[in-house]
Amino acid sequence: MAIPLVLVVLPLGLLFLLSGLIVNAIQAVLFVTIRPFSKSFYRRINRFLAELLWLQLVWVVDWWAGVKVQLHADEETYRSMGKEHALIISNHRSDIDWLIGWILAQRSGCLGSTLAVMKKSSKFLPVIGWSMWFAEYLFLERSWAKDEKTLKWGLQRLKDFPRPFWLALFVEGTRFTPAKLLAAQEYAASQGLPAPRNVLIPRTKGFVSAVSIMRDFVPAIYDTTVIVPKDSPQPTMLRILKGQSSVIHVRMKRHAMSEMPKSDEDVSKWCKDIFVAKDALLDKHLATGTFDEEIRPIGRPVKSLLVTLFWSCLLLFGAIEFFKWTQLLSTWRGVAFTAAGMALVTGVMHVFIMFSQAERSSSARAARNRVKKE
């Protein structure tokens, strides 16, 4: 039975925001005191800190909502996951694609060293956005004139990253919606391109730049395809917080970076061809309900559960001691202050939910304009 949202947002919000502020504070101290002297040591510690926060979101998906992620991969891809630097390119299908990536990274042992190219506004989100900034996520303004230098600088600084990392790049530039698909189809018709049915037309400038810079130190590109089966409801943050489950199928295919074309034009064509093939792959999945590759076991490790229990016990003990010491609930002013704090937490969680919703992302008109510029 679905749980009323109001009974979920407040306790989960308090848990995530308070633990997140603690993690953010430690990250800030380490950024100032350690990173200037040893970037490698800072990254190793920050990897652990990031997992202390991000594993709570993995727990929400895995244990609270019981979302099932089914991985399809060939033997080479499956054995390589988490053991090497990798550039991840994926279709952007749902509100929680980034969380699905975190789940797969956690299963592969590299959650704390996952990275992504994201829109600039993401880094201003309290707790989660700040943690991503400290973890060296790349934030772009969706204007190539401004973003080219930022992207190149951000990628070049990863050359000495001490642990295997995954860098996710959503080359479609925005989440898939029917309106954006229509805009992409109109543009494809005007340019004599294959009309997409299940994906958007990739924006390849960022991908070409990434391959050009990373081919010397990143051995692989993981072509990732995400789809929700027809008989399963679309996963959203709202549904997950309500404890409502879903099923997500993910197909991953490793491509050796050494086999990538050399010229920028050919790299761009390679990316576009991958998405044409991905479109056909999704057509086949819609018809058969599965991918051809073998289903790989990824389980549901208890690590995220243990981390969430740790934070729950720590913060509950701290809250009890705090209210004993301050006697905050013994006065009307204290009660009002506490109520205001809870309202603030609820408001911040509402912002998180709204931020994740695809229908609130870029409009179809903006999507059409971006495709034309590409």
UniProtKB/Swiss-Prot annotation:
CDD domains listed in its UniProt record: LPLAT_LCLAT1-like
Catalytic reactions on record: a 1-acyl-sn-glycero-3-phosphate + an acyl-CoA = a 1,2-diacyl-sn-glycero-3-phosphate + CoA
Chain positions of motif HXXXXD motif: 92-97
Entry's localization field: Membrane
Protein's membrane topology: Multi-pass membrane protein
Enzyme Commission number(s): 2.3.1.51
One term of GO molecular function: 1-acylglycerol-3-phosphate O-acyltransferase activity
Pathway where it operates: Phospholipid metabolism; CDP-diacylglycerol biosynthesis; CDP-diacylglycerol from sn-glycerol 3-phosphate: step 2/3
Functional description taken from the UniProt entry: Converts lysophosphatidic acid (LPA) into phosphatidic acid by incorporating acyl moiety at the 2 position.
Protein name: 1-acyl-sn-glycerol-3-phosphate acyltransferase PLS1
Organism expressing this protein natively: Zea mays
